[in-house]
């Protein structure tokens, strides 16, 4: 018998729903998967992002990613629940060859640390600067 396939479901929620409701959606869809005897490997909230084009008159959306392992029948159940939800504006499920490594979410703190790093100043003077100093001494 072959190995159980891996799946990754990415869905976009309306941008105007509160964070508590986003968490309840994540728990709801994880529970649907667990009820159909599927192992939820990872769930990540990717945050609010601008959409490439408007979807249902929304220019932004809250991205959520679910990685799961199962027999494939759970995908239809999960996607049906998402299709019936008014809060989900788009979803997609992709079959993976194996478990994907969990990407580390980038935080604003990491970005500010990168910006704060300044190049060291070169204390030696270039020949052009030395000539200017000599001219000013005369």
Swiss-Prot record:
Keyword Phosphoprotein: no
Domain of life: Bacteria
PROSITE patterns for the chain: RIBOSOMAL_S6 (PS01048)
Pfam families documented for this protein: Ribosomal_S6
Biased composition (Basic and acidic residues): 106-138
Alphabetic keyword roster: Ribonucleoprotein, Ribosomal protein, RNA-binding, rRNA-binding
GO cellular component, one term: ribonucleoprotein complex
Listed HAMAP family: Ribosomal_bS6
PANTHER family membership: MITOCHONDRIAL 28S RIBOSOMAL PROTEIN S6 (PTHR21011), SMALL RIBOSOMAL SUBUNIT PROTEIN BS6M (PTHR21011:SF1)
Function of the molecule: Binds together with bS18 to 16S ribosomal RNA.
Name by which UniProt lists this protein: Small ribosomal subunit protein bS6
């Amino acid at each position: 018998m072959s190995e159980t396939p891996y799946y990754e479901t990415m869905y976009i929620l309306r941008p105007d729903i509160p964070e508590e409701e986003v968490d309840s959606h994540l728990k709801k869809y994880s529970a649907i998967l667990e009820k159909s005897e599927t192992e939820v490997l990872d769930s990540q909230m990717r945050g609010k992002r601008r959409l490439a084009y408007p979807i249902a008159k929304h220019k932004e959306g809250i991205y959520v990613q679910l990685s799961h392992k199962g027999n494939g029948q759970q995908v239809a159940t999960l996607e049906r629940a998402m299709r019936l939800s008014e809060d989900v504006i788009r979803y997609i499920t992709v079959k993976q060859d194996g478990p994907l490594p969990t990407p580390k979410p980038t935080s604003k703190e990491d970005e500010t640390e990168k910006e704060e790093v300044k190049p060291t100043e070169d204390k030696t003077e270039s020949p052009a600067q030395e000539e200017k100093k000599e001219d000013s001494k005369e």
